[in-house]
Structure formats: structure tokens, C-alpha cells
């Protein structure tokens, strides 16, 4: 019910904003309306994130774990983020692999998307890299990581990163402002999936966010037996002409 109520409120606010847009005349009014629209979008995002946190904490949503090809996630990430990285002059590289992992496809996508979004938000120049490492301590696990050349995160700030409304302490060079809720959602998802999270960072030297996930064998493709289809034949009369 809470989710439906919030959706109705958001829809009503959007209708109000659209009605205003059709009636404004001056450029100043249009700027005010644009600010209102951005505020509405921010409020919707915050409410949605808070509801997600409440649902995760309340156990009303659970991960749907299954074998999942990591290649699908990595290729989608490259398509999703390469354009914005190019616009900002940031090198964006995704190192593809062919592992299958035990995960919830939607959850793992949201987790890594959050890491990449944060990296692009705070990196002014340089590169953002998505890659995979084998875990030295756990041979049947891999680490999916996002490296950036951003401003880095101080140790005292890293401790609080996964709390609600906490940010890295830096201002985005691109004018973006996060809600401070994305990593809080990541923390709850990784906890329910039993994925360790690792953060490596030093001020002025960039950051790396990693999660450790179990690998599984690729599902075997079972060939379907081919059924013989009887040929339908007709009787034909053969006429032979002798021209001798």
C-alpha cells in the first residue's frame, strides 16, 4: 500500500507540473518550473530509495538467486555508461569475462550500477574501470570491482559510507548530487546475498569498490531430440513418350 500511495502522489505531482508548464509564459517562470521538476524528481528518487530500504529491512523482498552469466551484466554496463563517460572525457573500460555466478540478476545489476554511477559522479578526469579478479582466499569466488581516478575517500569517511544519507565528503565536478542512499541499499543487498564488500581508497589516489561473489558451472545445454516427421507422399502416374 505504501508503494502504491507514493506512486499516486508522484503521478499527481507530475500532472501538476505538466499543467504549469503549459501555462507559463516568461523565461523566468520556465526556469522556476525546471527547478520544481528537478526537485520533484529528487523527492521521488529519495522516497523510492527509502521504501526499498524499508522493504529490504522488513524482509518483504528476497533475492531470487540463480546461475547468471556475468558477461550479460558487463556488456550492459558498457552500453549504459560509455556515452556519459565520453561526454565528460573520462576513459571508461569494461573487462569482459565469461564466468557464471550465483546471484540475483536484478540485485547484482543494481549494486554494480551504483558503484559505476558514483565513480563517474566524482571523477573529474582520468578513467573508470570495471574488472574481475579471482579471489586468493576463496578459489570458488571472484571479485567484481570498479576502479576510478577520483578524489579518493578519507578513512574516517569510509567507515560511514554505507549509512543512510552519508556521502564521500566531496562535491561532484559535474554538478550531480547523490541522495546518500545508494550505498545503504547496496549494504543491505550484499548482506542478504552474503557477499563481502571491500573498499580501497586514499585521498587523492582514487577508489575501488568490490564485491565478492561465488562462481558456478555454466548450465549444461540439453539438446532436444529431433522427432522424425513422416513424409506425406502422393501417388503419381508416370507418362513415358517414345518419339521413335
Predicted regions and their residues:
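Helix-loop junction within the histidine kinase core
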Residues: 54-65
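Disordered, acidic interdomain junction associated with two-component signaling
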Residues: 45, 156, 210-242
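Short conserved segment of the HATPase_c
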Residues: 153-167
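Glycine-rich ATP-binding loops of the HATPase_c
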Residues: 194-200
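A conserved beta-strand-to-alpha-helix junction within the catalytic ATP-binding
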Residues: 64-79, 239
Amino acid at each position: 500500500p505504501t508503494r502504491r500511495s507514493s506512486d499516486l502522489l508522484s503521478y499527481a505531482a507530475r500532472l501538476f507540473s505538466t499543467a504549469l508548464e503549459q501555462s507559463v509564459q516568461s523565461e523566468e517562470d520556465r526556469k522556476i518550473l525546471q527547478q520544481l521538476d528537478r526537485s520533484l524528481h529528487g523527492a521521488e528518487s529519495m522516497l523510492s530509495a527509502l521504501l526499498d530500504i524499508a522493504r529490504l529491512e522488513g524482509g518483504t523482498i528476497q533475492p531470487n538467486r540463480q546461475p547468471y552469466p556475468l558477461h550479460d551484466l558487463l556488456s550492459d554496463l558498457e552500453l549504459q555508461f560509455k556515452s556519459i563517460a565520453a561526454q565528460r572525457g573520462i576513459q571508461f573500460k569494461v573487462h569482459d569475462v565469461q564466468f557464471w555466478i550465483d546471484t540475483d540478476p536484478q540485485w547484482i545489476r543494481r549494486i554494480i550500477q551504483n558503484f559505476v554511477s558514483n565513480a563517474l559522479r566524482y571523477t573529474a578526469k582520468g578513467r573508470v574501470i570495471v574488472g574481475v579478479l579471482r579471489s586468493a582466499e576463496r578459489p570458488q569466488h571472484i571479485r567484481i570491482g570498479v576502479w576510478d581516478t577520483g578524489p579518493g575517500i578519507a578513512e574516517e569517511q569510509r567507515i560511514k559510507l554505507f549509512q543512510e544519507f552519508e556521502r564521500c565528503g566531496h562535491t561532484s565536478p559535474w554538478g550531480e548530487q547523490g541522495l546518500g542512499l545508494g550505498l545503504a541499499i547496496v549494504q543491505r543487498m550484499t548482506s542478504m546475498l552474503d557477499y563481502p564488500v571491500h573498499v580501497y581508497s586514499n585521498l587523492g589516489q582514487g577508489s575501488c569498490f568490490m564485491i565478492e561473489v561465488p562462481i558456478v558451472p555454466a548450465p549444461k545445454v540439453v539438446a532436444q531430440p529431433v522427432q522424425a516427421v513422416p513424409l506425406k507422399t502422393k501417388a503419381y502416374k508416370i507418362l513415358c513418350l517414345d518419339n521413335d
